[in-house]
Amino acid sequence: MRLWKSMAWGILLWHSQSGALCPAWPPARAAEEITRLQQQLADWNDIYWKQGVSAVDDSVYDQLSARLVQWQRCVGQDVSSTPVSPPLNGTTMHPVAHTGVRKLADRQAVEQWVRGRSELWVQPKVDGVAVTLVYQNGKLTRAISRGNGLQGEDWTPKIRLIPSIPQTTQGALANAVLQGEIFLQREGHIQQRMGGMNARSKAAGMLMRQDNASALNSLGIFIWAWPDGPANMPERLSQLAKAGFSLTKKYSLAVKDASEVERARQSWLTSALPFVTDGVVIRMAKEPASQYWRPGQGDWLAAWKYPPVAQVAQVSAIQFSVGKSGKITVVASLVPVILDDKRVQRVNIGSVKRWEAWDIAPGDQILVSLAGQGIPRLDEVVWRSRERSKPVPPGSHFNSLTCFYASATCQEQFISRLVWLGSRSALGLDGMGEASWRALHQTHRFEHIFSWLALTSAQIANTPGVAKGKSEQIWRQFYLARRQSFTRWIMAMDIPLTQAALQASGDRSWEQLLMRTEQHWRQLPATGERRAGRVIDWRNNPQINALSRWLAAQHIPGFGS
């Protein structure tokens, strides 16, 4: 199906000095859109941390938060107030600050980060809720939510109800501060196939609600930091395992370079794990003394996240395509995003009715994933722009019997018919894609779908946008098309039958086809009464009959006397 480009309606984009792709909004609209998105994120954030309820998927929240930061940078706005972390309601100080972890974008960034660093280890980046555990004299005395990294909520009563978290410790761990991730326990979770499952929100919800003590049985703990613990990493892991924190040892691997990090990352992505992950964390065994730990300053560790299964993409335009049958389909053009190494810049919305139900306009943020065979799929609208400027769809007068002849209103269906007749299902004109047909039609103004048969080799060679080698290929394909069977020419005329049914009919000429009754068509494979009626309508159509006479004049097999 071809795009109704004259009816497209979109938004302009520009690049900021920071290199970010920015909407070309007037200052007033930019301020309004930023404020609205900022408020929405703040509302979701508040619900998440106060009620333990996720109003939006974790990945969507993270991506929209990043989008907000991008917009703020586009207009030179301060980004420090962006609500991407929990509100500071807790006042319990962390004995050791949570540093957070720097994100590495790709393999190249990982190679650069590991260069010059030694004694490296890689661990799964468990997707859950960060916590500090404080042990004194062998007993768990405090449990504190991450908060802002310096202070957070006192979670001690809830943490004491989680069976998987040791309540007592011995030896070096009798008096220790541990940092880790409380996660939703899973059995045989394969990240690549099962995705994130909103595990972070579910874990947070269990910790925050007051009436679900039994649900805490499904939570686990993964310790990823023992500040001021043993300097030797194997010794550190061994002592943690003996104390009941066995997952840390099981899922910590020594690595030498980015290749080994990548292998571990891929293995954990495709293997059955007891938790949901969203990447890996690379860390140096040697860490500074805990007194020097500060939020945002943990340069001894970094994360390499998995690409999200679905991406939030900004709609840049709405376009309409008209297929050869006259069906109108709505397509959303997107600011390009990468999904599974595939560059996605458009997604099929479906019919006009479905588009109207989705209520999608340029500037909206939609969630896109890949369906079977890597086809982009619209999952949901996650954010709507304040301004609802939508194009008007083309009229509904197109059908399976329109646009065999070119006209101003038939442009897109006519091109769709040319693309179809050149496909392997019809005449099999190798190398004839939409761009080639558009170039020929724009220059030579075809009267109907077979006008190209009258082109000379010189005319094709002089077509702007068609290279010499390409023009020779086109001329040869057009020449060979004349030798195609009568059945293939009828398929090129878009008879409403399958090729198998048409072959079963046994027609070898237009005259023979005209003599067939509706009863004859009904008896063909996969035809029936309704399709037989459509064949009769097609055969009696004036444009189809005019095309048959023109093909006869061109001495196409089966059409002459």
From Swiss-Prot:
Membership in a protein family: Belongs to the NAD-dependent DNA ligase family. LigB subfamily.
UniProt cross-references to InterPro entries, sorted A to Z: DNA_ligase_AS (IPR018239), DNA_ligase_B (IPR020923), DNA_ligase_CS (IPR033136), DNAligase_adenylation (IPR013839), DNAligase_N (IPR013840), NA-bd_OB-fold (IPR012340), NAD_dep_DNA_ligaseB (IPR050326), NAD_DNA_ligase_OB (IPR004150)
Function text: Catalyzes the formation of phosphodiester linkages between 5'-phosphoryl and 3'-hydroxyl groups in double-stranded DNA using NAD as a coenzyme and as the energy source for the reaction.
Single GO biological process annotation from the record: DNA replication
Species name: Salmonella paratyphi A (strain AKU_12601)
Signal peptide residues on this chain, from the entry's feature table: none
UniProt-recorded name of the protein: DNA ligase B
HAMAP family: DNA_ligase_B
Keywords from the named record: DNA damage, DNA repair, DNA replication, Ligase, NAD
Record has Transport as a keyword: no
EC number: 6.5.1.2
SMART domains associated with the record: LIGANc (SM00532)
Catalytic site positions: 125 (n6-amp-lysine intermediate)
Catalytic activity: NAD(+) + (deoxyribonucleotide)n-3'-hydroxyl + 5'-phospho-(deoxyribonucleotide)m = (deoxyribonucleotide)n+m + AMP + beta-nicotinamide D-nucleotide
MF term (GO), any: DNA ligase (NAD+) activity
Gene3D superfamilies: DNA ligase/mRNA capping enzyme, Helix hairpin bin, Nucleic acid-binding proteins
One Pfam family, short name: DNA_ligase_OB
Domain of life: Bacteria
